[in-house]
Each structure stands twice: as C-alpha cells, then as structure tokens.
C-alpha cells in the first residue's frame, strides 16, 4: 500500500496482524518539502540528541506546523469531528480537546477513556470489523501494539526535528519520565542509591516500593531501557536477581505505590513518575529524586487509527499537540513535554543536570508486544 507525501508504507506485520493494512482516503494532504518521499516500515522510537535546539530548527518546525495547519484545517472542518481513544485521565484529555476546539472552531472533539488493555481490545475489534470509529489513539503502549497488528496508519510529523523522542510512524506528543525517587524523612542523602542499578543492593532490602516487573508497567519499560543501554545479558540478569532479592511485595499501580512512599511506608520508589514527584515537592511533601540517575523516558503518542473517519482532523490534532501551543497545554495539565527547548518544570532539560542523557525505551519487541518481551527476557530470571 502506498500513500503520498506524509505517509509511510505499512510493512508486513508479525503474528498479531489481521492480514490487512490501514488505508486512508485518496485526498490526503501534501505538505511541500515537509517530508521527502516515502519511507519503508516504521522504526520504533529513537532517541534524538539532547543538545540545545538551534533557533533555525525551532523556526523551521514552527513554519512547517503553520503550513500543515493551514492545509489541514479546511479539510478537517469539512469532516467536522475528531474522536480520541485514550488512556489519559479524563480531566487531562478534556482540557486538551477543549483547547484544540478553541484553536480550531468547527471541529467537535469527543473522547473515550479506558485502560490500555480495554483500549487495544476495542480498537482491534473495530478495525477487524471494518468500523470507522476512532481517529486518534492517544496512549503510551497502545499505538505500537496496534501498529504491529496492522491497525494504524503510519504518519511522520513535520515537526520531528524538535522532538526529544521521535518515531517516524507515530507522532510522539509527550513522555513518561521515570525518576529514582525517595522519601526525604526515611533515608539520608549519604545513603541514597546513585543509580537505578544500585537499588538492587542488598542494603536496601525492605526499603523499596517495587513495581511489578511482569505487568508491562513502568518497571518493565525501565528494564527494557536498561537491557538496550547495557547490551550485557549477565549484568541485566544480576540486576533482576538483585531486585528480586530485596524481598518486598510488588505493586500493580505506580501511583498507589508512590503514595506509600509519601506516607513513609517505604523509603524508595522503584520507580515514580517525574511529574508526580515534582507536583508533590511543590506541595511540600517530603519527597525528592536522585538527579545523578538518568531518567528513563517512554513515548506517549498520538497515532492515526487505520480506520479513522476523520483523518485530516486526526493529523491536525497530532501536529497541534506537538506545536508550542499544544505543548503548553500538555504542560499545564502536569504532563511531560517532548519538545526540545521547551521550558517546563518536568522537562529533562530543566529537571536534570546539563548534559544528562535519558535512557529511552526503544526495544522493538517491547514496544509492540511487552508481554512477549517480558516472557522472553524477564520471566525466566524473575520467576526462576
């Protein structure tokens, strides 16, 4: 299948595929010089350099967005609607869609919110049934899983050069940033672990609130990031065995686990999310994070659904989320931004020392099928 200009050919996909390809209407917009030619099968999220954004790159991205907006908006107005499937909190997605509708009158945005498993199941069922339902899948894990099943249409943002994390097939609009967090009343600065790996030291036995590594949650993605970063199977196995040897209960909810650290039931959160930590620090809660330990970053994306009834509105929404206006809205609701040079309390550039290189989650199998990745790489060690 081929789609002109901004769309990438959808490759043959692995065993989850229903044997069909996502396709869009023939009147897809073209943005001159924004994207050159067609690309092959989409690669997964790739970390871009964390260097300072040049003024030219920022100006070019802003111009590309304005050109895209100018071309897409009239077509999106004719469509008149935008349907978002998301795992974001209701108050967050409402704030974002409300601002989008103010910016682009004539487009009515609605949303359906669920957890990732329910979202993926519904989207795949509707795709298989040929239903033109959702336009945008706004989530972390779901877009890559749906892409692997052939249920997404590849789209590369015209603002790619200003992104910290960029996937050439699915626009990355935010990030999950994991911070090594602790209760300042439960552990002394001199006793803190200085890295994620150091948490597995036996001296922290009984002190760590540990996310369940087998639930495909934040700790699972952290393990995937470290496996890629280290490229050392023996070291990776020692890390997992060390975490298991801490002999603490595992938790199914990162937010609930973080509340236990706040309450002082544990000294260290493995892990916590940076935006939650900074929010609590602002309230005077006795928590902080280890700045020497590079954050783990995971893409939050706005992917174009393969049966999108309003594809122009979907592309416009994705581009707007990445724009300076969209990132400002995302920041205002407490979510992490992904745009380089964007001033935010929760940006990597602001929250960590200059030159900090995050650990990105880029493992292809993990992004497309986290359960399979865990069964292969973690389960034999964790449950062995």
Language-model features, listed with the residues they occupy:
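Short, polar/charged alpha-helical segment
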Residues: 36, 44-50, 66-77, 87-108
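Extracytoplasmic ligand-binding site segments that recognize negatively charged/polar headgroups
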Residues: 70, 83-98, 109-127, 132-265
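Short amphipathic alpha-helical coupling segments at ligand-binding clamshell hinges
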Residues: 96, 235-239, 300, 309-321, ...
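A ligand-binding cleft/hinge motif common to bilobed small-molecule-binding domains
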Residues: 143-148, 267-286
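Periplasmic-binding protein-like
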Residues: 162-165, 175-176, 203-214, 239-244, 250-251, 321-344, ...
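A bilobed periplasmic-binding-protein/Venus flytrap-type ligand-binding module shared by bacterial periplasmic
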Residues: 179-186, 223-227, 298-313, 329-330
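Extracellular/periplasmic bilobal clamshell ligand-binding domains
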Residues: 345-384
